[in-house]
């Protein structure tokens, strides 16, 4: 599957155009296969399918949307099974949970250990994982006495320029 073509134009939401996981579908699958092989983990058909659903859609999906897609593809649509797969993929850095949307998204940078940061359009619900170095924003964990931070996730909510333009012409 090829990457989506970038939109041209002065007022498009560039951060979402640049996102699309920075790799094509096949590259993402190859990365996860290599990781599982290197770590001696099983890339079961169910784990593969859940990851394919998330990487294919390039958007956050709720657990029940993932369950529906699994059911359509002939897999078990049992919530406990799906949540175990999602937890496993999150543990290994291939999926992130977007708390503000109660949804899951494939990681755009799975080969690097990082604390993810996301921008979320509250109008169109597009989500982009942003890179700390490229954005110029520092996500450094604060040094808090008597507390060890295990994970930091930053979610910034606003309205993208595309949604702003649609709002001006009452498309929402």
Could you describe each region identified by the protein language model?
Residues 1-40:
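N-terminal leader segment of winged-helix/HTH proteins
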Residues 54, 82-92:
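Basic amphipathic alpha-helical segments that dock to polyanions
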Residues 65-71, 82:
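A short acidic, leucine-rich amphipathic alpha-helix
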Residues 91-172:
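Non-DNA-binding regulatory cores of transcription-related proteins
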Residues 48-53:
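Pre-recognition alpha-helix immediately N-terminal to the DNA-recognition helix
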Residues 43, 57-62:
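Short capping segments at the starts of secondary-structure elements
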